[in-house]
């Protein structure tokens, strides 16, 4: 069915009050496309893979982080797609005004979940790039600058990075609690950590 102005307004005043404009809607055929300035319709007649949607109400499904990543592969440059994937797997949020929030306890998705979802997909523009990009996504970034640093250091040389092994972000290291070298804190989180080299890197901390 075609989304009507009243339905869109009700969603914008309720569960989707946080969303920026235009509101992107997925419709099954061209006849369902509306002309509302506050929305942008995308036509998809073929079935989508399991895990494409998250139910947030009796009559509302939101595209999952995995579906968002797959769809954005059709329009984003490759490195920007890797960055988006890392943000979807991060511990922070990005607001429409560009500011970051740090209230997440768990990331919306993981690199493994992205790869698994993309492996089930078919017939989507940019799918090959999405699968390649998912292999470069880092998990659990704690800030936009940690994401930027992980990409700069970990991306291959051909993509503008330094080609280092992909680091573990916000890795926990338990501290000694007794003896002459006992630490005040029970554990520390390393912004970037390379376990094979036993090297940790902190950004501005």
Give names to the regions the model predicted:
Residues 1-125, 147, 157:
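Short gly/ser-rich loop at a beta-strand->alpha-helix junction or flexible surface loop bordering the NTP-binding
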Residues 104-205:
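Surface segments flanking catalytic/ligand-binding clefts of nucleic-acid enzymes
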């Amino acid at each position: 069915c075609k989304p009507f102005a009243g339905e869109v307004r009700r969603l914008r005043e309720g569960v989707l009050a946080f969303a920026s404009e235009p509101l992107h809607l997925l419709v099954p055929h061209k006849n369902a496309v509306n002309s509302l300035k506050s929305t942008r319709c995308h036509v998809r007649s073929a079935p989508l893979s399991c895990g494409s949607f998250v139910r947030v109400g009796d009559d509302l499904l939101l595209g999952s982080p995995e579906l968002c990543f797959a769809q954005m592969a059709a329009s984003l440059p490759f490195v920007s797609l890797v960055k988006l994937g890392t943000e979807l797997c991060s511990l922070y949020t990005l607001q429409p005004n560009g500011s970051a929030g740090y209230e997440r306890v768990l990331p919306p998705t993981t690199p493994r979940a992205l790869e698994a979802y993309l492996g089930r997909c078919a017939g989507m523009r940019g799918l090959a790039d999405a699968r390649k990009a998912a292999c470069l996504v880092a998990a659990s970034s704690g800030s936009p600058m940690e994401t930027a640093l992980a990409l700069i250091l970990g991306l291959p040389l051909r993509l503008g990075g330094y080609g280092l092994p992909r680091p573990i972000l916000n890795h926990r290291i338990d501290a000694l609690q007794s003896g002459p070298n006992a630490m005040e804190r029970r554990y520390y989180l390393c912004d970037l950590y390379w376990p094979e080299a036993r090297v940790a890197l902190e950004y501005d901390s």
